[in-house]
């Protein structure tokens, strides 16, 4: 470490939902300070091993594995890896000597936070979802600050005096397009665009529901569907569309690499309820129909979706309801009821926290100046 250099450690991983917010904060701080040494701690099995280096940051690896919810002998291996990871985190933190540790959840963050506590290093916790994960619940008991993305999260943390509602950081590129230019770039200036996204891996039931929906709206020439099916579900989705004879009013893509442009162009979004998706949709004030995934830990996506629904920022359709008329009914309301559309757009904007990264950056500055 150079003289005058300040080190910060970020840790969180497993999924993009834990990693991208940390990267967004790191990017913000890097622009504000020219004397920062930013280091991530993760596992070489999680997505952080790809995402962090792609963004130009150093990453150090420790051993860690997620706890199995049921009683199983595999948890012995989890415990042994945890002990090993804790010791590795201690060695890394002793060497780097960070002024602050910022953890965003996932099983890798717990040994890092505990090591920071042992070394009396200030720790800031960020929770992206309405329902906190197990690691974050434990870390919240001893960290200095608990930053949340949803007001509803506050009730799950006992130390409410440490809780600050900041929102979930989103990448700056999300704000780089205006709606008219984005629509024009897609050749869809005169269309009501319904963007449907089932996550990076796709969602078979959601894909089929959206394709059936596009078939029912074929007579409505103003409405155009764009479906991001997921790489592994792409051929299946195309074949299903062909079997229904759907062609003219839907574009099926395996993956959307330029999501900021497509999201800007969209009038209505149909999406899962992952933390990043919710944050980006609301940051742009998009009315949405949210279909929470039932295949996630603690059913946290449904908590996220209900938090939006509570303030009128979205409609919620459960996975089990996809074959009902609910999805079609909600879409018709958003297309044909302009007053409802405007109200939901306004509620979405109020729910969104486009300034989340700056909010977190200001809290960091308090600790960096100590």
Curated annotation (Swiss-Prot):
UDP-N-acetyl-alpha-D-glucosamine binds at residues 15-17, 129, 171, 200, 256, 301. SUPFAM superfamilies: UDP-Glycosyltransferase/glycogen phosphorylase. One of its GO terms (cellular component) is plasma membrane. The keyword Signal does not apply. Gene3D superfamilies: Glycogen Phosphorylase B (3.40.50.2000). Pfam families: Glyco_tran_28_C, Glyco_transf_28. Keywords: Cell cycle, Cell division, Cell membrane, Cell shape, Cell wall biogenesis/degradation, Glycosyltransferase, Membrane, Peptidoglycan synthesis, Transferase. It is found in: Cell membrane. Cell wall formation. Catalyzes the transfer of a GlcNAc subunit on undecaprenyl-pyrophosphoryl-MurNAc-pentapeptide (lipid intermediate I) to form undecaprenyl-pyrophosphoryl-MurNAc-(pentapeptide)GlcNAc (lipid intermediate II). Belongs to the glycosyltransferase 28 family. MurG subfamily. This is UDP-N-acetylglucosamine--N-acetylmuramyl-(pentapeptide) pyrophosphoryl-undecaprenol N-acetylglucosamine transferase. It comes from Caldicellulosiruptor saccharolyticus (strain ATCC 43494 / DSM 8903 / Tp8T 6331).
